[in-house]
């Protein structure tokens, strides 16, 4: 029976050739070669490549390695600028992060009463610096306008 089924399997693969199958020989090669290349042939649409599965694993890992930790941190910074500061837990996180860097410490002899955490809300450092930057931009444009006015006035006085 095996000898009868052996010749019948190539005959079955030849029948799809007559029906217009674009890859008739791939199915016969897959059955002859073995299970490892059969998986690669199915994944590559009939092209036999013994290392195709290794290449696919590498391709799956590439998007994870293309995102650097710096990009993730910048994305988190963008998210913090858009957060609602009315959220008490989030405000405490920002207040704790500012406490790590002491800026204006009182003298050692003078001790202030501790503030309760629930009622203590301090603006995070990034909001203070952003407000200062916005003020500088406004004053810069005012300064440029003032410089232009004084320059034009000086030019007019020279012409007269």
Curated annotation (Swiss-Prot):
Residues 1-47, 98-122 are annotated as: Disordered. This is Dysbindin domain-containing protein 1. PANTHER family: DYSBINDIN DOMAIN-CONTAINING PROTEIN 1, DYSTROBREVIN BINDING PROTEIN 1 DYSBINDIN. Belongs to the dysbindin family. It holds the Pfam family Dysbindin. GO terms for biological process: regulation of signal transduction. Residues 1-39 have a biased composition (Polar residues). GO terms for cellular component: cytoplasm. InterPro entries: Dysbindin. It comes from Xenopus laevis. Signal peptide: none annotated. Residues 104-116 have a biased composition (Pro residues).
């Amino acid at each position: 029976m095996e000898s009868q089924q052996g010749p019948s399997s190539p005959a079955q693969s030849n029948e799809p050739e007559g029906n217009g199958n674009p890859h008739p020989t791939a199915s016969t090669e897959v059955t002859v070669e073995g299970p490892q290349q059969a998986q690669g042939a199915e994944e590559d649409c009939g092209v036999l490549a013994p290392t195709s599965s290794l290449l696919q694993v590498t391709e799956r890992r590439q998007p994870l390695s293309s995102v650097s930790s710096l990009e993730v941190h910048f994305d988190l910074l963008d998210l913090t600028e858009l957060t609602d500061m009315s959220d008490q837990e989030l405000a405490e996180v920002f207040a704790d992060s500012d406490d790590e860097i002491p800026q204006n410490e009182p003298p050692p002899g003078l001790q202030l009463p501790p503030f309760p955490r629930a009622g203590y809300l301090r603006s995070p450092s990034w909001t203070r610096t952003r407000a200062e930057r916005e003020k500088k931009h406004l004053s810069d444009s005012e300064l440029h306008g003032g410089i232009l006015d004084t320059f034009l006035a000086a030019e007019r006085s020279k012409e007269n």
